């Protein structure tokens, strides 16, 4: 038996909800396209379903906590409308290696437009949520050097809503009602630290 190949399939059962569900419904059918040897396939078919399910739940919990660590406002106790979006994110988006990368991926998921597969779920949220997600994604990317800063001075981005004011208001439960208001946000990199300072500027 090829340990690397078997471990690869076990890892996929751990992290891939689509594959895990296919294996749960029909293990031989899910394994057939993978080109496993008969002993490998037979061994993987004998894995206890409850073990696979438990490992999947642990992975989903771990990914969820990684996002929450970076994005405090992604709090389903305060905003239960995010629950189905989290489930869809875990199902559709492969896991990332680092916490910040997981949070950036979640921001991109929330930024997706009307043609995204999960667009109907996004439509249940306030219109400003994609703007919040973009603001937070840029904060993380700029802090960790994953997006370019100007050669000197801050980076300034335009938004359709007062996103920093909104983020502060999200300490309270629910979604605050906020009208569109063109706003600029200044991102200033903190030297030698994975951080940026942000402030809202009057729109020109």
Regions found by a protein language model. Give the residues of each.
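Terminal, compositionally biased segments used for targeting/anchoring and flexible tails
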Residues: 1-75, 80, 111
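Hydrophobic packing positions characteristic
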Residues: 86-203
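Surface-exposed acidic/polar loop and edge beta-strand patches at domain peripheries
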Residues: 76-78, 82, 96-99
